[in-house]
Regions:
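Conserved active-site segments centered on acidic
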Residues: 1-68, 138-146
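Phosphate-binding/catalytic loops
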Residues: 71, 81-146
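Short beta-strand scaffold positions
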Residues: 74-75
Length: 146
């Protein structure tokens, strides 16, 4: 929702797995944390895994993102509804996918929001996102134009 917990982790994880010519970004559907760094607990687990997300800043998803990105992964069903509501046509809607559907096709499983929990919740979210990003990486590298 606010682009400080799950989505910066996903951005950092996916960016670490892809060549530098891929553009990876994250955004929240809410405006609460625009310009803020990721939650300290997200930064901590990412750092433990060798990924630095401390320089990321929260931003809000915008209609322009449909033009700027080929794939838009969301963390939960509410984010999905919020992003789909901004889409102007079916081509834009087709870009939006729940990230855990990469692991559990058509299950529409949410990545739990760890914000109100303890560090363990962030660790679990990291592991889920890492697995999903491995699948995404393989798909992107397989489909990349030569």
């Amino acid at each position: 929702l606010g682009n400080i917990c799950r989505s910066p982790l996903a951005e950092g994880i996916l960016r670490s797995k892809l060549p530098s010519n891929f553009v990876v970004d994250s955004a929240g559907t809410g405006h609460w944390h625009i310009g803020n760094p990721p939650d300290a607990r997200s930064i901590k687990i990412a750092k433990e895994k060798g990924i630095d997300i401390s320089n990321l800043k929260g931003r809000q998803f915008s209609k322009q993102d449909f033009s700027d990105f080929d794939y838009i992964y969301v963390m939960d069903n509410q984010n999905y509804k919020d992003v789909i509501a901004l889409a102007s046509h079916e081509n834009e809607k087709a870009k939006v996918k729940l990230i855990l559907n990469e692991l559990f096709p058509n299950e529409n499983v949410d990545v739990p929001d760890p914000y109100y929990g303890l560090q363990d919740g962030f660790n679990n979210v990291y592991n889920m996102l890492d697995e999903a990003c491995n699948v995404i990486k393989e798909k992107l590298l397989k489909n990349k134009p030569r």
